[in-house]
């Protein structure tokens, strides 16, 4: 007869598998580590997750995470409202902010087009983006999706649609490596890509 772990532990392992890059073995190691060596850390993690799920929402304007209705960037009167930078994730937005080269506003897609995974225009809030970009204030849309196949397809789709509405559309320059994700690229490279962006 084989021994099964307690159901509470199995449930924890399954929950940890929801994290990106965490497979069954890694989830099991993390769960055992937390229960054996860091129960205080496990409790803090649980409280932080609960607090985040209860208090974080999407900004009504740019769709990033915020605790208020409108995020800090969208509320900043020093920002240039004629520039709108489209990124895939809040992590990409933070990387661009760290370059200190961009002073416009953002729209966060919360993903990228991936038909094989069932992610279409609706799932990346395409209609909200089009409404935001067509507000009469935005003059240039900077497409800062990642240089992966899905990111390029997303940029192409968005670029075609937004150009058809008379907007100037630019794309980050290729300082970012092919297949590269902004979250993992250094700030200097991203800054150069932003400054050298090209018209689509």
Swiss-Prot record:
- GO MF terms held by the record: DNA binding; zinc ion binding
Which positions fall inside the Toprim domain?
A: 82-177
Question: Sorted alphabetically, which keywords does the UniProt record give?
Answer: DNA damage, DNA recombination, DNA repair, Metal-binding, Zinc, Zinc-finger
- Gene3D superfamilies, per this entry? 3.40.1360.10, 6.10.250.240, RecR Domain 1
Record NCBIfam families: recR (TIGR00615)
What is this protein's function per UniProt? Answer: May play a role in DNA repair. It seems to be involved in an RecBC-independent recombinational process of DNA repair. It may act with RecF and RecO.
> Which HAMAP family does the annotation name?
RecR
| This protein's name | Recombination protein RecR
């Amino acid at each position: 007869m084989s021994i099964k772990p307690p159901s509470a532990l199995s449930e924890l392992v399954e929950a940890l598998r929801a994290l990106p890059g965490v497979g069954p073995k890694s989830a099991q190691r993390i769960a055992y580590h937390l229960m054996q060596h860091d129960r205080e850390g496990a409790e803090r993690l649980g409280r932080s997750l609960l607090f985040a799920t209860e208090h974080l929402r999407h900004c009504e304007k740019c769709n990033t995470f915020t605790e208020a209705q409108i995020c800090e960037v969208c509320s900043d009167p020093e920002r240039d409202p004629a520039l709108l930078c489209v990124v895939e994730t809040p992590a990409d937005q933070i990387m661009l902010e760290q370059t200190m080269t961009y002073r416009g506003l953002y729209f966060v897609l919360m993903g990228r087009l991936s038909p094989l995974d069932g992610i279409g225009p609706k799932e990346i809030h395409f209609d909200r983006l089009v409404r935001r970009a067509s507000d009469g204030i935005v003059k240039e849309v900077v497409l800062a999706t990642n240089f992966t196949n899905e990111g390029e397809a997303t940029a192409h789709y968005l670029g075609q649609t937004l150009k058809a509405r008379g907007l100037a559309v630019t794309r980050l320059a290729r300082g970012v490596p092919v297949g590269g994700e902004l979250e993992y690229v250094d700030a200097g490279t991203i800054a150069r890509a932003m400054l050298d962006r090209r018209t689509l």
